[in-house]
UniProtKB/Swiss-Prot annotation:
Coiled coil: none annotated. Keywords: Acetylation, Apoptosis, Autophagy, Cytoplasm, Immunity, Isopeptide bond, Membrane, Ubl conjugation. It is found in: Cytoplasm; Preautophagosomal structure membrane. The lineage of its organism: Eukaryota, Metazoa, Chordata, Craniata, Vertebrata. Conjugated to ATG12; which is essential for autophagy, but is not required for association with isolation membrane. Acetylated by EP300. InterPro entries: Atg5 (IPR007239), ATG5_HBR (IPR048940), Atg5_HR (IPR042526), ATG5_UblA (IPR048939), Atg5_UblA_dom_sf (IPR042527), ATG5_UblB (IPR048318). The gene is Atg5. One of its GO terms (biological process) is autophagy. This is Autophagy protein 5. It comes from Mus musculus. Its main location: cytoplasm.
Amino acid sequence: MTDDKDVLRDVWFGRIPTCFTLYQDEITEREAEPYYLLLPRVSYLTLVTDKVKKHFQKVMRQEDVSEIWFEYEGTPLKWHYPIGLLFDLLASSSALPWNITVHFKSFPEKDLLHCPSKDAVEAHFMSCMKEADALKHKSQVINEMQKKDHKQLWMGLQNDRFDQFWAINRKLMEYPPEENGFRYIPFRIYQTTTERPFIQKLFRPVAADGQLHTLGDLLREVCPSAVAPEDGEKRSQVMIHGIEPMLETPLQWLSEHLSYPDNFLHISIVPQPTD
């Protein structure tokens, strides 16, 4: 991969100032103060909210506490989506800090998966990495790794260790020089305006004539409504890690530098703010 390490670091250390507030109908023994945290964009809510849980449990009786879950403006937050994706998709046009409501009751079974432990997050994360490598390298790279390498990827993410994670992850970002890129680009496109969870299709980084495919090429093929017509008004923002990459950006470069730790490009299509 091309070595733009500053980009990788900026992506990894991206943070979202967040205010956690206990839901008003939760039963407490005294008033629950809000809890403030800088959330890592590349992580998952269930990995980084132990302190939030402890903070609110201090003012609650044990019998009033069941499985914790989070919500933003009425939408339950999926723990298996990276934090940065949740913010870009649901709150990118709102003021900071991001206001998240904490619940300990009435778990929304229809909307959320249960997360009994961090093992569930690890299993989901490794499953995504394996799927991404199946697309990129027919699973050859991830399958040639030892179990300790898989563990190092997970521990690097869990403990927020950039160098520990990238020492192994860089192998997943390599490809034979004669091929100009991966077999397929692992991506998922999310929209708030549809019931479908996300769009995911096979898409090559290089065209048959050797030209590099761009972000715009991908969108025009799989989500044309996200791209404004040349003479038309821009109706959507295309967000990755809180920024709007230029549509001319090569998809291979984006995959190498703006993928989340699970090796997927998580792309949010949100309505253009009207202000």
